[in-house]
Amino acid sequence: MVLWIGVDDTDSLQGMCTTFLATEIVRELTDDYDLIGYPRLVRLNPNIPWKTRGNGAISIRMGRGRGPIQTLGGIGGRPVRSYLRGDSPRDVKDLVAKVARCVERLSRFEDPMTNPAFVVLNKPAAPSLYWKAVRGVVGQRTALAAVRGRATVRRYKSGRGVIGACAATAWRPRDRTYEVLTYRHPDRWGTERWIDPDSVIRMDRRFPSTFNNYDYENERVVIAPHSPCPVLFGIRGDDPSVLPAAMATVNGEVPDRWLIFETNQGTDDHVSPHSAPQAGTTVRIRGDVRSAPRVLPGGHVVLRIGDMDATAYEPSKQFRTLVKALDVGDRVQAIGAVRRLPWTLNIEKLNVEFVALVQRKVGNPWCARCKRRAKSTGHKQGYRCPRCRTRFPMSAGTFVQVERKLKPGWYEPPVGSRRHLSKPLKRMWLEKAETLVESRRSSERSTLELRDLAEFRDPGPDTAARPTR
């Protein structure tokens, strides 16, 4: 067995990054211990109100390595190498002391919202803890109970970071992505980053397995954060083998160090399946549009889907144009976070399943007896001839069909407006393509097996093998 290290809640809005602390832990430990597998960046419930930024915790496995070796990064001019498998190190106390020094040296203790913690486990927490933490709210007692008897725990201040630290070790990937994170020289922290946008565009087009690199709709580089943290840029993708080359394609400020993380970003792990909407969760709702979209002050667009309001907020940019194109009768599936005040679904992705026929009234019905137009008797109350008082139903008006450009299919906000955990449509299409290819391969294998079976002939007793002379 290897040792599992989990760390969380060390950064703040004013600086630091828990992944940078991970690089320091790796640098401190790899003189005496071996890195096993990829370090992990595990995003948890994005709707937690007390999160600092992206609600990401880290998990690192250390031990005595064995098996194949791969290079995952570079720190201090030295390559970071990782083993596929490993055994437990002998000196656990020394490892704990080194992790503690890193956490205590780099955590932003002065920030009232920062409450660091770390755990060192001889066995990771059960996967159920991860699913609770990525989809709901977990307390410290629950997290500590999940690692009781197998952990060294250090909590600082309120110790709230122990929740993410334990949950990060509990992640067993059903789906995964990777991110190569590059970091700035310490003397440049807090200054403006310089990254050549054209090189980011070239990288995005050259490496199709990467995603969320550049916002073409708003002409904005997305791989670089805007906070004063140590991160220079990060490139996310499905194939970790291409990430070093993708990193080298980006021109600009020279990184001080880099490291590839295995992550749950872009997986939709935060979406609760088959659950009723609850505040602070991310759910999937399906229903008919029951009210025409309306624009609120600030540019937010709200409409009613089934029995719930759904909103495309201003930061979703051009995505609001799609939402405004919906109309009563359209059938949609929406994925989003449930807000308590106001009670609404903050739309992350939208699947238009059916586009309704929409008609617009261009005239009131004609009274054939009086040769004049009938008048409306009120909202949805029909019509009445002002002379002979003959009544007409609503359907008697003159209508024309409205041309609608909206097409069925999935839609998402621009690259720069997406959440860390939200699965990009690009990944959804890739998964569907892979499933289709595998289905065809299975079909071809089945066809070959049937063909082989048809060609098989039982030799029978007359053609039994005879002894050779």
Tell me what each language-model feature is.
Residues 317-333:
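Short nucleic-acid-contacting surface segments enriched for D/E, G, S/T with interspersed K/R
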Residues 291-316:
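OB-fold (S1/OB) nucleic-acid-binding surfaces
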Residues 69-276:
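Long, hydrophobic alpha/beta structural blocks
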Residues 241-299, 322, 351-361:
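OB-fold nucleic-acid-binding modules
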Residues 398-469:
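Long, charge-rich boundary regions
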Residues 337-366:
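OB-fold/S1-family single-stranded nucleic acid-binding modules
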Residues 367-370, 385-388:
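Short cysteine-rich clusters marking metal-coordination/redox-active sites
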Residues 284-290, 328-343:
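Flexible glycine-rich surface loops and low-complexity tracts that mediate binding to linear polymers
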